[in-house]
Swiss-Prot record:
<keyword id="KW-0472">Membrane</keyword>
<feature type="transmembrane region" description="Helical">
    <location>
        <begin position="471"/>
        <end position="491"/>
    </location>
</feature>
<keyword id="KW-0571">Peptide transport</keyword>
<keyword id="KW-0813">Transport</keyword>
<feature type="transmembrane region" description="Helical">
    <location>
        <begin position="653"/>
        <end position="673"/>
    </location>
</feature>
<feature type="glycosylation site" description="N-linked (GlcNAc...) asparagine">
    <location>
        <position position="759"/>
    </location>
</feature>
<dbReference type="InterPro" id="IPR004813">
    <property type="entry name" value="OPT"/>
</dbReference>
<keyword id="KW-0653">Protein transport</keyword>
<feature type="transmembrane region" description="Helical">
    <location>
        <begin position="274"/>
        <end position="294"/>
    </location>
</feature>
<feature type="transmembrane region" description="Helical">
    <location>
        <begin position="533"/>
        <end position="553"/>
    </location>
</feature>
<feature type="transmembrane region" description="Helical">
    <location>
        <begin position="501"/>
        <end position="521"/>
    </location>
</feature>
<keyword id="KW-1133">Transmembrane helix</keyword>
<feature type="transmembrane region" description="Helical">
    <location>
        <begin position="697"/>
        <end position="717"/>
    </location>
</feature>
<dbReference type="GO" id="GO:0005886">
    <property type="term" value="C:plasma membrane"/>
</dbReference>
<keyword id="KW-0812">Transmembrane</keyword>
<dbReference type="GO" id="GO:0015031">
    <property type="term" value="P:protein transport"/>
</dbReference>
<feature type="transmembrane region" description="Helical">
    <location>
        <begin position="421"/>
        <end position="441"/>
    </location>
</feature>
Amino acid sequence: MKTPKFITYVTRGFKGLESKSVENNKDHIVENSSPIASKFHEFDEQKKSFEIINYAGHEKFVDDITERESSVPGNAVYDITVRDIDAIVPVTDDVDIPASTFRMWILAFGLATVIAGVDAFFLMRYPSVSIAAIVALLVAYPLGQLWYYIIPQWEIKLPRGIRVSLNPGRFNRKEHACLYIFVNICVSAKLVNTLIIEQIKFFGVNIGIGRAILFNLCSYLSSFGWSGLALPILVYPPTLIWPSVLSSCALFKIFHDNDNTKACNWTISRLRYFFIVFVASFIWYWFPDLIFPALSSLGAWISWCKPSSAVLSQIFGVKTGLGLFPLTLDWAQISSLSNPLITPWWATCCIFTSFVFWIWIVLPGLYYQNYWQVAHFPIMTNSIYTVSGKSYDAQKVVDSKWELVTQKYQEYSPVMLPIAFIINIALSLGAFSSMMISFFLRFPTDVIQPICHVFKYSDIHTKLLKKYKRVHWGFYLASIIVSLGLGFAFTEGWHDIQIRSYGFVVSMVIGAALYIPLSLIESRSSFTISMQAFFEIVAAFWFNGQPMALLYFYSFGFGTLQHAMHMTQSAKIGHYMKVPPRLVAALLFTSGIWSSLVNSAVTGWIMYHVRDVCTSNAENNMTCRSPKTQFNSHLIWGLVGNHIFSSDGRYSFVMWFFLVGAVVSVVVYLLQISFPKSSWKHVNPALLLGGAAQIPSVTGINYSTWAAVAFCFNYLIRRGYYSWWKKYNLITAAAMDCGVAIAGLFIYFCVVYTGGSSNFSWWGTTVSSAGCDKKGCAHLSVSDISKPSGW
């Protein structure tokens, strides 16, 4: 039965009005409020104006979109639709709700400074810790409410009649969203922080804090410009849901709305449900992370029965094995790919199919047949080896200028790659070509059509935002031009970093070209395909034997790409939460500049003022293990990457995956247009290749348990108990992530950092580290390796 059209009258004097209708569907019964959410209006108690909102057009739009995007054979539910997000995203707006307040800006700058500074500091420490942006979202709410209760309602008079209120009232949803947007940008600077550390401590180039800020500003301003120009393509289209931002939007709803509709006989409110799950997640995470770490690796129990067995550890191990037994009680392990509760079921199917085929079928076949002598090394590792089975020390084959010395290379050892590393590179290249071919095949519908229809969207979110002025596209273009100027100054002003302006320009062009295709995939699947290997391959062939040039080529392009995608995510949050577009632009612009200053200043200060930092003699374990790993990787790629992957190189076959990706993309496209109503329309060819490219950082236990949880929630529960899923699924996702994030901080700062866990040991803490799974036992002995000729 079609939901009736009606007009909802909203009076600001009445809070929490609800309108309920029940829609009977042949698949399930949905309790909804004419898909316009439960609480209609946030209001200002000081004003009593009257507003009429007609949602009939939105209802028809939602029905059309839902039918077009989610009707699949067998009534299976594959996707997250526009109708689903109406349960947690407000479909009303009050222009009188203050967003750009003094309180918001102070809290945003304060939280961003603390979190970004802590992240930059602890990046150099082992073990490291990072604070997720969702922690700021949680902390901001009590801080905002505390501000409301203790700060007097004074006004500051500024020139030209401007008045700034110190306390504009209760901490509201828009302020909360703005604060989160600001912090989310500031905490995404790990890549550029790593570059500063590599340059100063490992390459020995004294770039100084000023040049570090210049590099950061160049990256952020370019990202801001591209993300702004792409708003009509990536943010405004209502079919681009961006599932990765929905859990944050769900938290905004439960903190600022009080509605409580019944779902499958569950009457518990979203807020109460969130705190129950949050507390349970917080308490439980202490067990797999500290008290009983074996719970995190339960899938490896078969290898524990015989720890010395290399074969058992290779098949069932979860650290250096395939992880064939899907069992873990650690949410951090389950959600290491992405949060499975917010990943659409079609994307889960594509990604897990990719993993099963490439990692559980192809990879073992190549490994046990000993192609390229990979059976002499661990089956699942990202290390690079010598012919003697030791970790490769690239500093033994370079001169004082960090350039390759061929004679030293021949005397030392050729580079030997493990099978997981090889497959990772091959799949990354295949994902690139598949993604780009699909992008060009769908260019009219994915790019041209959104641009042409930017003023014609009939969804309620776009309609409500039409009352606000948008930023002129010229401002974004100017930002890109300024970033290019800063990049030219950085590359041509000094001559100690091996890269010139032409390399910088090409890197930025590649990053910009990849930005929209990658964002389109993430906006639909919540999964990010890594292009790191592609950037490194291009740089390795272009800057032959110049690892420092590779580092900057990779950092300029990949850094711009990452920041632009973060900014687009944040812009979508602003779109959902009805934050004025000009304010969103101001937040993104300001946060990028502030992040450049804070991260560069903290990292640079530590580099120049902390004694022995990034050495084995460093105090407080400030050994920079993660940046050192990245340094070794960039060094090897820059020195020999072009040789080992060229036509006469030992691993040249990976280049064929450019063709493999293109063929897969064309075949899938032909099947989709030939059978438009079949399940092929949900298949993404880039995910069929890039879905498994996260290995060896994550293994089988991560993929299999992630897919199992996604199947349980996003297929079984959604299909059988849709009203429960619609009300509680995203709340569950947010609560689990928040519980783990907060518990991780408590464990680190209260126990690990203070040394409290150093003497805590029993079977549950040692069993997973006692055998071949931890050591990475190889199938064949390293003594039997025959040194390959050439590169």
